[in-house]
Amino acid sequence: MDKFRVQGPTKLQGEVTISGAKNAALPILFAALLAEEPVEIQNVPKLKDVDTSMKLLSQLGAKVERNGSVHIDARDVNVFCAPYDLVKTMRASIWALGPLVARFGQGQVSLPGGCTIGARPVDLHISGLEQLGATIKLEEGYVKASVDGRLKGAHIVMDKVSVGATVTIMCAATLAEGTTIIENAAREPEIVDTANFLITLGAKISGQGTDRIVIEGVERLGGGVYRVLPDRIETGTFLVAAAISRGKIICRNTQPDTLDAVLAKLRDAGADIEVGEDWISLDMHGKRPKAVNVRTAPHPAFPTDMQAQFTLLNLVAEGTGFITETVFENRFMHVPELSRMGAHAEIESNTVICHGVEKLSGAQVMATDLRASASLVLAGCIAEGTTVVDRIYHIDRGYERIEDKLRALGANIERVKGE
């Protein structure tokens, strides 16, 4: 397994170009299964999960090519099963189920893998599809969905806010007979992006970005060209990198209005922030950040995917900060690793109490999930001495060329190839 070796401390400053959003690209790739004409998807990040998704679409019979953009022609899809060997590494494969059953009347997906963060059940996906008229069976580790004729529109009230299930229901409902209303829908920018992609193909969707999405079913979806929105979590990660190293950064090709909660907390931490139409600049003027209190919650509140990075910020900040995680359980696995580097933190239930220290020291640490691993790499950039981050395949699932981008900002980081 590959590792990162990071030599610190360094001040991170300069410019970085943000990639397309993984959390929008994946649902959009699977939504392309609904299209009866070719689609072109631009600004798709080069990531492990994207490669796996493209491989899965190919196995289902779609023609998939990548030459800058990703081109998908799903006209000849003739396999309706997403097998375990591909699904085991990536939870997003559940998103194949809605499009398959909506367009072809059948689909089966192996129960998924991915990051090990607490309970991420597929129940909400299943109950949503059942309310649209699908018959669901769980057999031999597979979720099997089928319907006679078309799915039927329904009024669906989500038990809890779920990005994944909102995507599944919205995609399936585009080809259902009649109108579907999703109440308590997720409001994330990536949901809006997926809806806008479907609209490009001819879907009738309104209310995306609110907690009530209305989908009027259509007979078929055509093709089109669509550009994936920039990755707000990658943007936030690089802004934190500059903040903790007391540096200065400009993030280009980003979308500032998707990051309001994060920018507010960075300002609270003492950062000088300016935004343009597609750029954000952050300048710490050489100052140490101040500790902030953060509570994660569904969008538009503070994103859980920025929690680990702000935990790190608090651990090197002036003062004491509280970080409360309300979205996922078991999402503080980075804290013991950061403690090995000299951080001072206590975990009480779903809150981590961070007592800022002047400096961290390099150590051997292990990545446990995608965002936690990013925080360990950033910690290595500002720690004194050498940090080795193990199991970085987690990072490769969600960050495109992170070491190249950090190196361009002044980091001393190298990838050590595993056996």
UniProtKB/Swiss-Prot annotation:
Enzyme class: transferase
Cellular localisation: Cytoplasm
Catalytic activity: phosphoenolpyruvate + UDP-N-acetyl-alpha-D-glucosamine = UDP-N-acetyl-3-O-(1-carboxyvinyl)-alpha-D-glucosamine + phosphate
Matches recorded under InterPro entries: Enolpyruvate_Tfrase_dom (IPR001986), Enolpyruvate_Tfrase_sf (IPR036968), MurA_subfamily (IPR050068), RNA3'P_cycl/enolpyr_Trfase_a/b (IPR013792), UDP_GlcNAc_COvinyl_MurA (IPR005750)
Active site: 115 (proton donor)
GO cellular component: cytoplasm
Assigned EC number: 2.5.1.7
GO biological process: cell division; cell wall organization; peptidoglycan biosynthetic process; regulation of cell shape; UDP-N-acetylgalactosamine biosynthetic process
Cell wall biogenesis/degradation is among the record's keywords: yes
Pfam families for this protein: EPSP_synthase (PF00275)
Keyword S-adenosyl-L-methionine: no
One of the record's GO molecular function terms: UDP-N-acetylglucosamine 1-carboxyvinyltransferase activity
CDD domains noted in UniProt: UdpNAET
Amino acids binding phosphoenolpyruvate: 22-23
Residues engaged in binding UDP-N-acetyl-alpha-D-glucosamine: 91, 120-124, 160-163, 305, 327
Protein task: Cell wall formation. Adds enolpyruvyl to UDP-N-acetylglucosamine.
Family in the record: Belongs to the EPSP synthase family. MurA subfamily.
Name under which the protein is recorded: UDP-N-acetylglucosamine 1-carboxyvinyltransferase
Organism name: Escherichia coli O157:H7
Lineage, opening ranks: Bacteria, Pseudomonadati, Pseudomonadota, Gammaproteobacteria, Enterobacterales
